[in-house]
Amino acid sequence: MLPSASRERPGYRAGVAAPDLLDPKSAAQNSKPRLSFSTKPTVLASRVESDTTINVMKWKTVSTIFLVVVLYLIIGATVFKALEQPHEISQRTTIVIQKQTFISQHSCVNSTELDELIQQIVAAINAGIIPLGNTSNQISHWDLGSSFFFAGTVITTIGFGNISPRTEGGKIFCIIYALLGIPLFGFLLAGVGDQLGTIFGKGIAKVEDTFIKWNVSQTKIRIISTIIFILFGCVLFVALPAIIFKHIEGWSALDAIYFVVITLTTIGFGDYVAGGSDIEYLDFYKPVVWFWILVGLAYFAAVLSMIGDWLRVISKKTKEEVGEFRAHAAEWTANVTAEFKETRRRLSVEIYDKFQRATSIKRKLSAELAGNHNQELTPCRRTLSVNHLTSERDVLPPLLKTESIYLNGLTPHCAGEEIAVIENIK
């Protein structure tokens, strides 16, 4: 039952249903790919409604995707092994030769003392200290700017790994800080993604309006606007920061782009970190880098959201096309079945008409034959019927069999005349 307010409001027509949001056709018309997270308030449905609307991925589909991911991992492992293992073997051989050369040139140092020194150097590097030159002049990795940058890498889940807490208090605080900060940063990332997507959406809408005036198809407009959005974002959040990092950090162009992509995808290997070199940086350098990470992650979130919307639209269109194909197939089957039934009915009618016509002709011929019998065969003497009296039947002479022919109760000598009459009628 509809509420009374909905029945009484002007312009409401009874019997007109609202568009079905679950219908693939209406969903494909109303849902456009957006460039950000949903800005509409979330409405929690009841348990019954959620059970009917949520589509759970089948185990067969999950297993297929799992196998695809495992295959992708095997391919990646094979490629990385082929590219990186020869370099690793070369470096290992080189360091062994250098150690032997150093010991041979410095007889006062034995191999045990050299190994202990190398272990201390490795521990210092793992702690974030670069043991080169005069370590007393090195900048601390735990000053306010560096600590701010580290806290940012914790809540963004990047975790470069170049520095990490070494004390028990630092580890405990890092655990609590991450559990509280990651959800908080998620809300911030969603809000920034919405605003960034709105800005880009308005720009793309203007571009689409321009192309519409040029009578360009909607599909081409959508493809062109998407390419423009991605290219503009790549220039603003990938190419330009890579140029800046190349200039400040002294990296190559490939290393700078590598750092940008690894950072904005939250992989964060830690082999390249902005502000991690043994040079003097400005105080606001690392906080600015973190804010760039925030906006860049929001951009990537907007791109991923747009791709997800596009995939949903494509899926709905595919379901719609499959539904239309099934409808056409069902319609074709129904038409073929109806045509077959109609053909069978027509054949039955024609056969029945021919049968009726043949029956009518047979009856007519039988009637004519009976009339001719009465006119032409009266001289012949017929045998008595079963209704004749016994006295009358006894008066007649007994019937003689002539080649076993007894036609219409005629005596045998009239059978030849009867056959001749039938031949004349035919």
Swiss-Prot record:
Q: Which family does it belong to?
A: Belongs to the two pore domain potassium channel (TC 1.A.1.8) family.
Where is the chain membrane-spanning?
62-82, 172-192, 224-244, 288-308
Q: What is this protein called?
A: Potassium channel subfamily K member 2
What's the domain remark here?
Each subunit contributes two pore-forming domains 1 and 2 which assemble to form a single pore with M2 and M4 transmembrane helices lining the central cavity and M1 and M3 facing the lipid bilayer. The transmembrane helices are bridged by the selectivity filters 1 and 2 carrying a signature sequence TxTTxGYGD that coordinate the permeant ions. Up to four ions can simultaneously occupy the selectivity filter and at least two elementary charges must translocate across the filter to convert it into the open conformation.
User: Where do the record's region annotations for Selectivity filter 2 lie?
Assistant: 266-271
Residue numbers carrying Phosphoserine:
S348
Q: What is the lineage of its organism?
A: Eukaryota, Metazoa, Chordata, Craniata, Vertebrata
- GO cellular component terms, semicolon-separated: apical plasma membrane; astrocyte projection; calyx of Held; cell surface; dendrite; endoplasmic reticulum; endoplasmic reticulum membrane; neuronal cell body
Entry GO MF terms: identical protein binding; ligand-gated channel activity; mechanosensitive potassium channel activity; metal ion binding; outward rectifier potassium channel activity; potassium channel inhibitor activity; potassium ion leak channel activity; protein heterodimerization activity
Protein role: K(+) channel that conducts voltage-dependent outward rectifying currents upon membrane depolarization. Voltage sensing is coupled to K(+) electrochemical gradient in an 'ion flux gating' mode where outward but not inward ion flow opens the gate. Converts to voltage-independent 'leak' conductance mode upon stimulation by various stimuli including mechanical membrane stretch, acidic pH, heat and lipids. Reversibly converts between a voltage-insensitive K(+) 'leak' channel and a voltage-dependent outward rectifying K(+) channel in a phosphorylation-dependent manner.
Which residues does K(+) 3 bind? G159, F160, G268, F269
